[in-house]
């Protein structure tokens, strides 16, 4: 199902970029040539989204791949989880960001990466770190990582389109002198793009993020056998991200993280890409109670 949704998003990106190419072509006076520019851009963006979305996400976080000698505990826990999940151990990255957080990315379990922020390593104990890694491995095994990474590129593309439309309105004029009405119509569409594009990008992120976080919480807690450790980690991360702003997280990639990296910013909670931490913790505590009763 995730593969079908990913294909749908790639097709949607193609259609969007072709339409945008047509509108921008009218705005800057190149006519239907804008359609071909949009199609070419769609080919480039779709290829980048599928093959390089993980590299884009990791570069955005300024993450560096680490070795077992540099991060022995991370590798020990990751190797253990790889066996439990029955997947290859993902590549391990560390971001210098002091705001504690983590995310998984990649095309599939054989081409996956897990990134943890330096701030996370500083505040979590081993059990909590294990719970967070188990959550991220859940995304890998559930094959959430490709669609989430593609959505990140799509959201970034939509934001870029809004910026291009803004520059087109400022400097592109309103089409050729012989076609003022068409140019004015293109300008109106461009203005609507500026207003609606960021909202569309956010709605796409919301559509793929919230339910997957609940599922990764459940999967991670089941595999680790310790829902309360993950619940404790979520409490710490939620408090810390409120007071330690992220230095690397970009809005287009916010939905990848285990907790919203932009939660400390104004208006961030209005359309959060993540479900409420309180509800996630409640579900984990309920799981822990069920495990105790079953034992």
Model-inferred region functions:
Residues 190-195:
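Hydrophobic alpha-helical transmembrane segments of integral membrane proteins
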Residues 1-15, 26-36, 41-188, 199-295:
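Polar-ligand-bearing catalytic/cofactor-coordination segments
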Residues 16-21:
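Hydrophobic, membrane-inserted alpha-helices
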């Amino acid at each position: 199902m995730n593969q079908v949704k990913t294909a749908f998003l790639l097709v949607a990106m193609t259609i969007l970029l072709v339409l945008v190419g047509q509108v921008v072509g009218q705005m800057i006076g190149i006519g239907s040539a804008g359609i071909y520019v949009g199609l070419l851009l769609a080919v480039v963006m779709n290829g980048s989204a599928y093959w390089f979305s993980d590299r884009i996400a990791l570069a955005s976080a300024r993450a560096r791949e680490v070795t077992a000698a540099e991060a022995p505990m991370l590798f020990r826990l990751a190797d253990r989880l790889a066996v439990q999940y029955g997947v290859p151990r993902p590549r391990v990255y560390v971001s210098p960001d002091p705001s504690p957080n983590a995310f998984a990315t990649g095309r599939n379990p054989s081409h996956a990466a897990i990134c943890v922020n330096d701030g996370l390593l500083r505040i979590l104990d081993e059990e909590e770190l294990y719970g967070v890694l188990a959550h991220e491995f859940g995304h890998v095994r559930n094959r959430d990582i490709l669609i989430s990474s593609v959505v990140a590129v799509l959201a970034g593309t939509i934001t870029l389109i809004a910026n291009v439309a803004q520059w087109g309105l400022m400097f592109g004029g309103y089409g050729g002198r012989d076609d003022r009405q068409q140019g004015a119509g293109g300008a109106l569409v461009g203005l609507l793009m500026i207003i609606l594009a960021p909202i569309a990008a956010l709605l796409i992120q919301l559509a793929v993020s919230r339910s997957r976080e609940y599922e990764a919480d459940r999967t991670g807690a089941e595999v680790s056998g310790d829902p309360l450790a993950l619940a404790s980690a979520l409490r710490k991360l939620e408090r810390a991200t409120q007071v330690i702003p992220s230095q690397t997280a970009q809005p287009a990639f916010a939905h990848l993280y285990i907790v919203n990296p932009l939660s400390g910013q104004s208006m961030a909670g209005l359309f959060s890409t993540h479900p409420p931490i309180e509800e996630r913790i409640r579900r984990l505590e309920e799981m822990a109670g069920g495990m105790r009763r079953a034992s």
